[in-house]
Amino acid sequence: MGSLESEKTVTGYAARDSSGHLSPYTYTLRNKGPEDVIVRVIYCGICHSDLVQMHNEMGMSNYPMVPGHEVVGVVTEIGSEVKKFKVGEHVGVGCIVGSCRSCSNCNGSMEQYCSKRIWTYNDVNHDGTPTQGGFASSMVVDQMFVVRIPENLPLEQAAPLLCAGVTVYSPMKHFGMTEPGKKCGILGLGGVGHMGVKIAKAFGLHVTVISSSDKKKEEALEVLGADAYLVSKDAEKMQEAAESLDYIMDTIPVAHPLEPYLALLKTNGKLVMLGVVPEPLHFVTPLLILGRRSIAGSFIGSMEETQETLDFCAEKKVSSMIEVVGLDYINTAMERLVKNDVRYRFVVDVARSNLDK
């Protein structure tokens, strides 16, 4: 993808080690190829998986690392073969920026499951340069892994949809969890969970939020629009709710028992795992086989599904609940995220930070 054009130097906020502390970092973008677009970043959401990568919790982090995979910006340059986008258009970049394009997953519009997928950050581009994410002034991205932001969708609202939004939209479409009136449980009410409530309601489902305490009950019911709220530590209420749900989307990103939630499913019910949990999870098989229940997993979504998510949310007027912060606040935001002290997604106003000035 090389070219003779001059190199572009940009500034981002990078972690230098597993402490995860982010500070200004200047680096060179890879050269623009014929199918690349250069995106000036305007907003970038903060995801829990950013913490996982920054702190090397999976044991595969490379530093310096500029996180951020819920990127919204404007196209400033395009390669000679770019047909999808024009300079000046608002676009989004999600969790992946490359794949092999020849395997069965890629050919089946499931690029997120390609074994050679390239992560938006903490990975290596085809040309050998490291990928860096959206906590930076600009990015170079292959047009195939860029989506268009609908005109009636506020840019800051679009950012969480590029990860949290498509993470729930994709399994709902794939597993047929879109029939109005069906009962869906949302386990965990964080960034992904709150989008689960909103998108499930937009599909016409009856939504029950399941949480470990009643701290978010009023907000879940009155603000997010959930139909019911279940405290998992209330054994009596959990028993009353047994075999009442058609589906559960499990968004919890830490180790937790599965048995209490499998018991909530009807016959043929599905528990879909969405959280990245590095420890083993345990359950007893009778809870599955005596109700023909199933446990499945789902990972973000394809590029096609990501565009669908944006278009669906724009059409249905589905908004994310966000707190917009500047890059000068980003380390505090990360500390608050560890404590689950955000309703429900931080979005960084990157453009306001004037990184390259």
Curated annotation (Swiss-Prot):
Gene Ontology MF terms: cinnamyl-alcohol dehydrogenase activity; coniferyl-alcohol dehydrogenase activity; zinc ion binding
SMART domains recorded: PKS_ER
InterPro entries, per the entry: ADH-like_C, ADH-like_N, ADH_Zn_CS, CAD-like, GroES-like_sf, NAD(P)-bd_dom_sf, PKS_ER
Cofactor: Zn(2+)
UniProt keywords, alphabetically: Lignin biosynthesis, Metal-binding, NADP, Oxidoreductase, Zinc
Catalysed transformations (reactions): (E)-cinnamyl alcohol + NADP(+) = (E)-cinnamaldehyde + NADPH + H(+); (E)-coniferol + NADP(+) = (E)-coniferaldehyde + NADPH + H(+); (E)-sinapyl alcohol + NADP(+) = (E)-sinapaldehyde + NADPH + H(+); (E)-4-coumaroyl alcohol + NADP(+) = (E)-4-coumaraldehyde + NADPH + H(+)
Pfam families (UniProt xref): ADH_N, ADH_zinc_N
Residues that, per the record, bind NADP(+): 49, 167, 188-193, 211-216, 251, 275, 298-300
Family: Belongs to the zinc-containing alcohol dehydrogenase family.
UniProt-recorded name of the protein: Probable cinnamyl alcohol dehydrogenase 2
Phylogenetic lineage: Eukaryota, Viridiplantae, Streptophyta, Embryophyta, Tracheophyta
Gene name of the record: CAD2
